[in-house]
């Protein structure tokens, strides 16, 4: 049975979507069957996998609305072993539509539970907020990965996210684990980057992945070509970092790599 992992941080610009797309692609290269669910109205994970967002007619919106089954919305991507439930800007309206429903936090869980037998990993790219979309993802997930950028204000809002996770564990999903914190946008030349790494490891030592994602020009270029870093430049630092991250995740979950 597959594992559902939400990639979440309400702070924007931390490498959340970059991590979701490239972790999915890396796991696919390592011959794991992966489904990426784009739960962010900005739909950057969708476009980052080469899908024309304007051409998306059904996706996460319909899944949460329960007007389409999750299986009906799945599309194949050009990344090996990676499927996608795409997003569109209309997803921004779903929180308003769900707000009056009694089981509003469970809509995604109900919709995707049957997919766990079809995939090794289901990755959910969360919106940069702690609204209903993110609550749905955390309620549906087995665990959560928290990307943290190695920059000023890196820990800002982290306490609020951890409190939200505790609240979800208490009320909606007692089995939710923190898979780990992933340090991103690291530049070894900068004192600040090194200070952030030290600070995060000091406070959350056993929760931090050993792999650190370095700042990399090619990593920033790949989304504009609708490609993962693995496909865009497999020899780049970014590709190597995310393949290392995928291997670390598999080892953590005691899978052969």
Where are these regions (language model features)?
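P-loop NTP-binding core
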Residues: 1-257
